[in-house]
Amino acid sequence: MAQISKEALIEQIRDGIIVSCQALPHEPLYAEKGGVIPLLVKAAEQGGAIGIRANSVRDIKEIKEVTSLPIIGIIKRDYPPQEPFITATMKEVDELAELDIEVIAMDCTKRDRFDGLTIEDFIKEVKKKYPKQLLMADISTLEEGVDAAEAGVDFVGTTLSGYTSYSPKVDGPDFELIKNLCNAGLDVIAEGKIHYPADAKVIHDLGVRGIVVGGAITRPKEITERFVAAVKK
């Protein structure tokens, strides 16, 4: 696995933008044979991105062929009827750990899990199996972030705010959650509904360790919909 210290990674992503480059099978940029996501990555890097967040073994392997930027890796896999699907079990962690990436992100919400574990026990199992792997907790509330950090994750991401039944539904970043996590002394990577550069600046000034922007950069369908909706108001 990528042997980078937490401190070195923080220094590398400081004052920059991590770009999430993903496309799921039902989305326009998904290609069965691959090849599209690396193009997005190259464009993001040329634009100044200092890191990449990516989904799936295939995409990450292709991305590593075109960039040496640090990667936050996930595997989205459904386990119905349970809701968590972002690196939701040890199976996905094992697959990501083989890819030599800097950070593995996992669903660390309090929702019922397919493996039946508490999130604290899951984190501890991952830490025991991969003690040198940096981990990011995708959470939706302050409590989830604090609990994940206490269980041993390195970074707390606001990725799932608004995507759990009990978190605020807003069309934009959860500034309050980001601020509260930072005030709690956690190493925060802000992510989720960061639509505009001004949002990123506000978040940066809250004291986060990193900022992930996805849809506003790499999902042209969503970007188009936002413009169309604006002119129809």
UniProtKB/Swiss-Prot annotation:
Respond yes or no to whether keyword Isomerase is given for this record.
yes
Question: Which pathway does the protein contribute to?
Answer: Amino-sugar metabolism; N-acetylneuraminate degradation; D-fructose 6-phosphate from N-acetylneuraminate: step 3/5
The record's section on InterPro entries has:
Aldolase_TIM, NanE, RibuloseP-bd_barrel
Gene3D superfamilies linked to this entry: Aldolase class I
Q: Does the keyword Isomerase apply?
A: yes
Q: Which GO terms describe its molecular function?
A: N-acylglucosamine-6-phosphate 2-epimerase activity
Tree of life domain: Bacteria
**Catalytic activity as recorded in UniProt:** an N-acyl-D-glucosamine 6-phosphate = an N-acyl-D-mannosamine 6-phosphate
A Gene Ontology term for the protein's cellular component: cytosol
Q: What is its EC number?
A: 5.1.3.9
Q: Which UniProt keywords apply?
A: Carbohydrate metabolism, Isomerase
EC class: isomerase
> Which GO BP terms apply?
carbohydrate metabolic process; N-acetylmannosamine catabolic process; N-acetylneuraminate catabolic process
Query: What protein family does this chain belong to?
Result: Belongs to the NanE family.
Q: Which NCBIfam families match?
A: PRK01130.1 (NF002231)
What PANTHER family would the database entry show? N-ACETYLMANNOSAMINE-6-PHOSPHATE 2-EPIMERASE-RELATED (PTHR36204:SF1)
Q: What is this protein called?
A: Putative N-acetylmannosamine-6-phosphate 2-epimerase
Per the UniProt entry, what species is this protein from, by scientific name?
A: Streptococcus gordonii (strain Challis / ATCC 35105 / BCRC 15272 / CH1 / DL1 / V288)
